[in-house]
């Protein structure tokens, strides 16, 4: 996973500019909701990638600590030259967030949740919530399943995860975890950690928000 996204870093943001009016409208809605809900917050961003979402949330957040494991994507994120008083880009492991030395009252992770192996979800969420204060606002967004986009969804025997093959321009191919969820599944996953849980299942993307218990 890290190798794929590191090698794809320079073209990663192309996924946000597909000429699909429904897709574009939903992306705008996600941006607007993030900016509204995280306004004035000290925010943790998990798997920030190239800083695409960071640049919008920084418009209203008090400060963002944006974490990613890949040096390559962080280099591109830093090229956006966001104010250091507003954003700190940090190389870090999303599965070891409990090692952070500060806490936050807001957090988000966009287009990361689908890449978490299902057997690691609870561990990730436990460590994620360790660094969030009670009442913190959390937002997440990810893809709805569309069989016409992204190639064949691969299932394996005795494996609850699903996978897709991703190809780069130079011909390299990578098999990555890509899991999709129903509203009922998302409810069951997040309810133990959440109050005021809101789940929106749209055409292209799902979006959730909640307050930390």
Q: Can you name each region flagged by the protein language model?
A:
Residues 108:
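A conserved beta-strand element that flanks and buttresses the S-adenosyl-L-methionine
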Residues 141-189:
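C-terminal alpha-helical "lid/dimerization" subdomain adjacent to the S-adenosyl-L-methionine
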Residues 50, 174-211:
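Conserved Class I S-adenosyl-L-methionine
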Residues 111-112:
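Short catalytic micro-motifs in class I SAM-dependent methyltransferases
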């Amino acid at each position: 996973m890290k190798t794929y996204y590191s090698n794809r870093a320079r073209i990663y943001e192309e996924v946000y500019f597909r000429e699909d009016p429904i897709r574009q409208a939903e992306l705008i809605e996600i941006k607007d909701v993030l900016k509204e809900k995280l306004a004035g917050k000290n925010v943790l961003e998990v798997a920030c990638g190239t800083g695409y979402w960071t640049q919008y949330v920084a418009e209203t957040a008090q400060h963002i600590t944006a974490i990613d494991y890949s040096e390559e994507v962080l280099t591109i994120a830093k090229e956006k030259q966001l104010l250091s008083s507003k954003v700190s880009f940090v190389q870090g492991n999303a599965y070891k967030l409990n090692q952070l030395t500060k806490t936050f009252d807001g957090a988000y992770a966009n287009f990361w949740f689908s890449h978490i192996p299902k057997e690691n979800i609870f561990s990730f969420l436990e460590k994620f919530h360790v660094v969030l204060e009670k009442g913190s606002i959390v937002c997440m967004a990810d893809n709805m399943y569309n069989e016409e986009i992204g190639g064949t969804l691969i299932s394996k025997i005795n494996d609850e995860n699903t996978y897709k093959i991703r190809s780069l321009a130079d011909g390299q191919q990578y098999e990555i975890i890509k899991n999709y969820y129903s509203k009922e599944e998302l409810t069951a996953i997040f309810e133990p950690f959440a109050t005021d849980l809101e789940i929106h299942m749209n055409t292209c993307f799902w979006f959730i928000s909640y307050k930390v218990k």
